[in-house]
Amino acid sequence: MDENINELISDLKTHLEYLKGMGIVSLPASGMKADEPGQSTMITLEDVRKELGDCKRCKLHRGRKTIVFGEGNERATLMLIGEGPGYDEDVQGRPFVGKAGQLLTKILQSINLPREEVYIANIIKCRPPQNRNPEPDEIQSCTPFLMKQISVIQPKIICALGAFSAQTLLKTDVKITALRGKFYDLEGIKVIPTYHPAFLLRNPERKREVWEDMKKIAELLNNA
């Protein structure tokens, strides 16, 4: 019995952390009716963008040119999440527009998904210096806005591009080689990690594995 209670408490803590990440800090009291879908209190991506504003919540704002919020279909069934903006993305203010982005577009085309039909974002929205990995305080500042984006879009599948994205979303330090190709649960949304397109540019022999992962995504979307 104690073991079951401890497991329940652990699950509740995980769920509350997820809600906090989405910016939800309170829940309706007993007997009060929660907001119904479609009511005016439902937020949009534009609401999230306005809340983000000219963000200076962490030190990354000092060196950025633009905030890379994300782009795509607000009702996408597939959401792709990378690590952070690179040089080209920082200049243009759009995610995945460099060589890695061009490869990502081709990968999506391979499963008959136009880029315009998906939503693409990153764990963080400002380019880190020298494209280094984001630091914990930077992730903490940016993650609530990503979680709100996920909450608005409600995709059926999230494809985590690269080790950093997968490990951040799944809260694990397991290597991408072990994570990729499998589906995990994030509050009812299927998450499948795969290699980052930039990694594929350096290691083209791994493209076959990404192709296998994308086929799993296509199959799940087609059967939804």
Feature-to-residue mapping (PLM):
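Short, small/acidic-rich helices and loops at N termini and domain boundaries
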Residues: 1-9
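A polyanion-binding, active-site-adjacent surface
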Residues: 10, 14-21, 25-224
